[in-house]
Amino acid sequence: MVGRTPEYLGKKIQAREVKLVAIGTLYMPVVVLIAAGLAIATPDGRKSIYDSGPQGFSETLYAYTSQTNNNGSAFAGYTGFLQPNAPGNQGAEGVTFADLMGGLAMLLGRFIPMLAALAVAGSLAAKRPAPAGPGTFRTDSPIFLVLLVGVIVIVAALSFLPALALGPIVQGLTHQLF
């Protein structure tokens, strides 16, 4: 960075904190996209997906997003266990893959961002507070709120918009349900 060191609550934010926040922020989308990609790209993973086309992709993406965020819900068409006798379905063979990948997504999605947040908190707690100066960016101002919401929306859009373009957006534009 060029210029002044940023501050938050009177504590200087340095490169270590920025890296930890980046890990905590980007970790969830990376786990979701890798898990959904493996489910779609591998034969065992495809057995877990009942619906084809954009609906099947949306179900897979939603399942891993939910599991990585520790909710664990899924659309009814995800995992072969839910529709064992449906035409073209391989029965319950894909359940093991879906269960193992879902459990791994939950495990990774829960602890890595938590550890990153705790590391940032510990790093900031160890620092001495700096006195507020004339250039201090106040956290109780409307501009802080606008910038915070803007960054959240931009990071979320950049993380999932390409994947959403393959699923729900295509489904909505083509009116193709299955």
Question: Which role does the model predict for each range below?
Answer:
Residues 13-28, 139-151:
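Alpha-helical transmembrane segments and their helix-start/interface "positive-inside/aromatic belt" motifs
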Residues 74-77, 81-87, 91, 128-161:
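Internal helix-turn-beta structural module
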Residues 1-14, 119-139:
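Alpha-helical transmembrane segments
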Residues 25-38, 118-122, 147-160:
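Hydrophobic core segments of alpha-helical transmembrane domains in multi-pass membrane transport
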Residues 38-42, 113-126, 157-174:
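Membrane-helix cytosolic exit motif
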Residues 101-108, 154-157:
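Hydrophobic alpha-helical transmembrane segments of multi-pass membrane proteins
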Residues 46-105, 163-178:
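P-loop potassium selectivity filter motif centered on the GYG triad
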Residues 28-36, 55-66, 107-126:
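Hydrophobic alpha-helical segments of multi-pass membrane transport proteins
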